Amino acid sequence: KIYDHDAYDMDKNVYLGTTRRGTPVYLDKRAVEADKVILTGGITPHLFAGFGGGRKSVLPGIAAAETINHNHVMALSDTIGGGINPDTCLAKTWDNRVSDDMCDATALLNPCFLVNAIMDADGDFYAVAAGHWYEAWLEGTRIVTKQQGVKAKAKADIAISSGGGFPRDMNLYQGMKAYVPAAMALKEGGVI
């Protein structure tokens, strides 16, 4: 059987505990009660969680809205009006409180296995990460970094960037996926 997770029906989600950052973890009751949980998906760079895949199958994947909201607000600065927290950024898995919180929530469920695809620019399989839910995912992030990362000799004064057109730039959030990497390549005061 295939089920759609309902993040808003608290009768279908159960409390497992709290993360180190105070996020109350409510997950889909069916997953919590399952004999085995296998995480599936794909690993891609992610604006705030560093990379997609792995623990994101649990949070936000099968988490209640309260859990998701508590986690996602960590992408913002602690200062009102401060914008995005610079430690929650693209391709960063260490000291990234959004990602760390997702890992804490996933550890409470403790999935038995992970299978995540890594795709190439044409949408074909490039590699598969499989094994322990954290270790295999982390190795997959290294593969994605080698496959998609670009080393710059120096920061630039100007960067030209494009999301690639619709649907990759259909709203501000999607458009940021082109803006953020360009901003990472700029000198202080540089122009996109």
Provide a role label for each language-model segment.
Residues K1-G52:
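An acidic, phosphate/nucleotide-engaging active-site surface
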Residues I2-D4, L59-A75:
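Short, acidic/small-residue loops that bind anionic groups at enzyme active sites
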Residues V25-A34, H46-G50, M102-T106, K146-K151, ...:
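A generic local secondary-structure boundary/capping motif
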Residues T40, H46-A49, P60, T67-H70, ...:
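Short helix/loop capping segments that flank catalytic or ligand/cofactor-binding pockets
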Residues I68-A91:
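A gly/proline- and charged-residue-enriched helix-loop-helix capping module
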Residues G83-F166:
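Membrane-embedded hairpin module used as a gating/binding unit in multi-pass transport
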Residues D169-I192:
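C-terminal catalytic subdomain
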